[in-house]
């Protein structure tokens, strides 16, 4: 088992104790992700499917729970072992949440919801925010790349229409990002996000 694939450990430390902080009787938690604004007034949503396929399609295992218990206890956190054991026993290790989102590649005005997540089992109300860290990381990096390249494409196209051939736009921003990012996963996510807007790339992991 690789620690990086253990979804239980794919969170912030403070999230681990939050199950103790919800009001008594809580049965559901609904969270959403939005771009609150910045340099651009529109965001290109991208990255969620890659996260789901990589981290959520496989169930957690007893080994995942044991390893998480050992690590988080040593880290000084009150691990919700009973909650994760319940997920393993009741749901065969699959996480009882539903995630909804706009289609990948959609251009969305800022201050609008991009994705939502909520628990589907009242016993697992705490799970929604446990997954927040991983979801934000999974979405914001490729979404930022896709958004940046979308706006860069507009600038290039404006000048092509004045001085060149607009039909060549798809190959006017070439991606060599594989050599400049922190990991192969980052290269793949950023490279795929670039391909939402352009066709030129040397980032092989982006087309896998």
Specify the residue positions occupied by each region the protein language model found:
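Generic structural signal of hydrophobic/aromatic residues within well-ordered alpha-helices
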Residues: 48-56, 67-72, 83-88, 131, ...
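Active-site-flanking structural segment that lines cofactor/substrate pockets
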Residues: 65, 69-104
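Generic detector of short, locally flexible boundary/turn motifs and exposed helical patches
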Residues: 63-65, 76, 80-82, 118, ...
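Low-complexity, highly charged intrinsically disordered N-terminal segments
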Residues: 29-80
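Buried, small/hydrophobic-residue-enriched core segments of structured protein domains
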Residues: 2-39, 87-96, 105-109, 114-208
């Amino acid at each position: 088992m690789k620690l990086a694939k253990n979804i239980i450990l794919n969170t912030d430390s403070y999230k681990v104790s939050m199950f103790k902080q919800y009001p008594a009787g809580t049965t559901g938690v609904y969270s959403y992700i939005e771009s609150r604004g910045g340099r651009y007034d529109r965001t290109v949503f991208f990255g969620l499917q890659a996260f789901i396929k990589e981290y959520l399609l496989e169930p957690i295992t007893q080994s995942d729970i044991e390893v998480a218990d050992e690590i988080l206890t040593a880290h000084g956190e009150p691990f919700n072992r009973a909650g994760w054991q319940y997920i393993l026993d009741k749901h065969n290790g699959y996480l009882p949440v539903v995630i909804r989102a706009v289609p990948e590649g959609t251009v969305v005005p800022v201050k609008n919801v991009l994705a939502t997540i909520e628990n589907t089992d009242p016993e697992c109300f705490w799970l929604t925010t446990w997954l927040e860290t991983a979801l934000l990381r999974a979405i914001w990096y490729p979404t930022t790349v896709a958004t940046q390249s979308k706006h860069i494409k507009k600038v290039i196209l404006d000048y092509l229409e004045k001085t060149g051939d607009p039909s060549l736009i798809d190959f006017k921003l070439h991606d060599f990002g594989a050599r400049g990012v922190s990991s192969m996963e980052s290269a793949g996510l950023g490279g795929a996000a670039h391909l939402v807007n352009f066709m030129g790339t040397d980032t092989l992991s982006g087309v896998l």
